[in-house]
C-alpha cells in the first residue's frame, strides 16, 4: 500500500507541477518552527518529499501529521485561527475534509485552508525553479475555489493516484 500522501491544490495556478502543503525549508532540513506554505509539489521527482508527506492513516482520522518531523498542523490559537502552526500532535481532529474539496477548521467551518492569491515567490532550487505561496485559513468562498480546493495524491507501484478528500 502507501504510507505517505501529499495534499495538492486542484488548480495548478502558475506552476504546472502544482502546489502542495509543505513545511518551510528544504526537505529533510525543513524548519517546523517556520510553519507551512504552499510549494511546488515535489512528486514530479518520482516520490513524495518528506516535508510534503502526510501520514495516510492519520489523515483518514482527519489529522494532518508529518511523520518525518513528528508534528501535526494546528490552528495557532482559537483567537487567531487564521494562521497555522506545526506542533506535537494533541490527538485532536482539527480539520474536516469536506465534500466540496475544501479543508475546513472543525471548530469554525467557515474557515478553509487557502493559498494566497499574490504572485508566487521563487524558491532556491528546482528546474524550472520551484514556486512558493503563503498558506492560511480564510473564509470559505466558492469564488475563491481555485485557492481553496484540494486533492490527495499518492504513489502506488510507481504511479501517482488522486483521491477526493471526502473519499479518503
Map each language-model feature to its residues.
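Lectin-like carbohydrate-binding module/patch detector with strong preference for beta-trefoil
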Residues: 1-168
Amino acid at each position: 500500500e502507501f504510507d505517505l500522501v501529499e495534499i495538492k491544490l486542484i488548480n495548478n495556478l502558475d506552476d504546472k507541477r502544482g502546489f502542495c502543503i509543505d513545511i518551510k525549508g528544504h526537505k529533510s532540513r525543513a524548519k517546523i518552527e517556520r510553519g507551512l506554505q504552499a510549494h511546488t509539489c515535489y512528486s514530479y521527482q518520482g516520490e513524495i518529499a518528506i516535508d510534503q508527506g502526510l501520514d495516510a492513516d492519520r489523515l483518514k482520522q482527519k489529522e494532518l501529521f508529518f511523520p518525518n518531523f513528528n508534528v501535526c498542523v494546528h490552528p495557532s490559537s482559537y483567537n487567531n485561527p487564521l494562521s497555522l502552526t506545526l506542533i506535537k500532535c494533541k490527538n485532536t481532529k482539527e480539520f474536516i475534509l469536506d465534500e466540496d474539496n475544501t479543508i475546513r477548521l472543525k471548530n469554525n467551518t467557515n474557515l478553509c485552508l487557502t493559498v494566497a492569491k499574490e504572485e508566487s515567490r521563487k524558491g532556491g532550487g528546482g528546474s524550472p525553479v520551484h514556486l512558493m505561496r503563503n498558506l492560511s485559513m480564510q473564509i470559505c468562498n466558492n469564488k475563491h475555489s481555485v485557492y481553496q480546493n484540494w486533492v490527495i495524491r499518492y504513489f502506488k507501484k510507481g504511479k501517482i493516484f488522486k483521491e477526493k478528500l471526502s473519499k479518503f
